[in-house]
């Protein structure tokens, strides 16, 4: 039995929104970094202890220094590109620090 078209439309919008939420959380990259005295030299040029978390509020990112048996790495989490349907619109983030500074999407469900 097929769903009525309005119900199908609502279900599709919610599925798209769920996919959007998954994409928003996917902005993590890991880069090998220089080390100094057992610490990471971050993208900011500063020395950071292993497991230390720091933020760059200018580009809305979170950084973490990690060390495993292969070397030192900086994990960088940033906002990701958002793809959304035409009945939705982009809204500014609610804060100044990652992840609250990332844009979001709001949708009109008729």
From Swiss-Prot:
It is found in: Secreted. Contains 4 disulfide bonds. Its main location: secreted. Residues 1-26 form the signal peptide. GO terms for molecular function: toxin activity. Expressed by the venom gland. Keywords: Disulfide bond, Secreted, Signal, Toxin. InterPro entries: SVWC_dom. GO terms for cellular component: extracellular region. Belongs to the scoloptoxin-16 family. This is U-scoloptoxin(16)-Sm3a. It comes from Scolopendra morsitans (Tanzanian blue ringleg centipede). The lineage of its organism: Eukaryota, Metazoa, Ecdysozoa, Arthropoda, Myriapoda.
């Amino acid at each position: 039995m097929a769903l009525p078209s309005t119900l199908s439309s609502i279900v599709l919008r919610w599925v798209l929104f769920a996919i959007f939420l998954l994409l928003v959380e996917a902005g993590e990259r890991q880069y090998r970094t220089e080390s100094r005295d057992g610490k990471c030299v971050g993208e900011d040029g500063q020395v950071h202890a292993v497991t230390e978390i720091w933020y760059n509020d200018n580009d809305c990112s979170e950084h973490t220094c990690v060390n495993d048996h292969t070397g030192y790495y900086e994990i960088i989490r940033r906002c990701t590109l958002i793809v959304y349907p035409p009945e939705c619109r982009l809204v500014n983030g609610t804060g100044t620090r990652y992840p609250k500074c990332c844009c979001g999407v709001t949708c009109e469900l008729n």
